[in-house]
Design a protein with these regions (language model features):
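Binding-site signature for planar aromatic cofactors or substrates
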Residues: 1-160
């Protein structure tokens, strides 16, 4: 599999965000119950790390205190991507990738990180909800990734 945050993985997560406007981060609570949190602000770096803006998640930061291990799932949900794949009975790229890693500490976002988020949200800049959701994002939480895993769908992904 590809190293976490390789060019291919970064491209896949960008496509996943474009088709879903979020990725999913799985964590476990204090009773070892799994839970999934949708995150719309995950950005990957090129050194097997990433970060997300932590304005809305409430449970994920609590889970990080007891168990910082997470699994990040990015799925390309583009209708055209899926229809082409179903028509041809094969995918040209993996439909999903999971990244395994650990959450770091919450910290103040840098100006560069804030600009990266603004660039990602540029397409929704003129919409009312953009200001509500994406303005005043001040804090990020780092994630260091240890492993990337492709999502296999039998014969449709065997050739990849």
């Amino acid at each position: 599999m590809y190293p976490p945050c390789s060019l291919y993985v970064s491209k896949h997560f960008n496509l996943s965000f474009r088709s879903n406007f979020h990725i999913s981060i799985a964590s476990v609570d204090e009773h070892n119950n799994p839970t999934v949190t949708p995150i719309g602000s995950l950005l990957l770096n090129d050194n097997q790390t990433g970060f997300y803006f932590e304005k809305y998640p409430k449970k994920l930061p609590i889970h990080a205190e007891g168990n910082p291990n997470v699994c990040v799932l990015g799925v390309n949900s583009s209708t055209l991507f899926w229809l082409k794949s179903l028509f041809k009975n094969k995918f040209k790229e993996y439909p999903g990738i999971k990244l395994y890693g650990q959450l770091g500490a919450k910290r103040k976002a840098t100006e560069h990180e804030t600009k990266r988020l603004q660039r990602r949200m540029k397409a929704t800049k003129l919409l009312k909800g953009n200001a509500y959701l994406w303005c005043h994002m001040q804090y990020v939480r780092d994630i260091s990734f240890t492993k990337a895993e492709k999502i296999n769908l039998g014969d449709m992904t065997d050739h990849l």
